[in-house]
């Protein structure tokens, strides 16, 4: 069974905090533990990590659109799976690019609409499109610019 090797989260906001661009390394698919205080972001992390697998999934009424900016800046979530049954290490990355748009409903209230596309990449060694190197943002004039 494939195991999660690394997870990359880009541009997720919650409780006044931001995950700008972080890679969580699970060192060859070993078990992982998130030990955070209440309000530390465990639910946000789990909900975010599930997005490439079940886009739009929510937990206990918290919607992924609550963690996205409304200014058309995309967020990315990527999971690198270590495949089993291969002679040399082999990886499969599943990813999603998320953004939200505010749409005016019939009752003149704004409705948060999730927009996304998914992508995949398989590889057996590091390359320009692996989870670490795929270019989804850069810093220009002290600000992050997202693609």
Predicted regions mapped to residue ranges:
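Extreme N-terminal "head/tail" segments of very large remodeling/mechanoenzyme assemblies
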Residues: 1-145
């Amino acid at each position: 069974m494939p195991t999660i090797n690394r997870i990359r989260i880009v541009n997720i906001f919650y409780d006044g905090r931001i995950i700008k661009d972080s890679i969580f390394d699970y060192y060859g698919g070993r078990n992982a533990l998130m030990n955070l205080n209440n309000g530390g972001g465990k639910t946000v992390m789990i909900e975010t990590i599930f997005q490439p697998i079940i886009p739009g999934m929510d937990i206990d009424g918290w919607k992924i659109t609550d963690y996205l900016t409304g200014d058309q800046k995309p967020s990315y979530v990527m999971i690198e799976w270590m495949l089993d049954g291969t002679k040399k290490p082999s990886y499969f990355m599943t990813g999603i690019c998320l953004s939200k748009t505010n749409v005016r409903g019939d009752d003149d209230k704004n409705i948060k609409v999730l927009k996304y596309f998914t992508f995949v990449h398989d590889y057996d060694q590091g390359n320009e499109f692996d989870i670490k190197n795929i270019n989804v943002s850069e810093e220009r004039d002290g600000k992050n610019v997202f693609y």
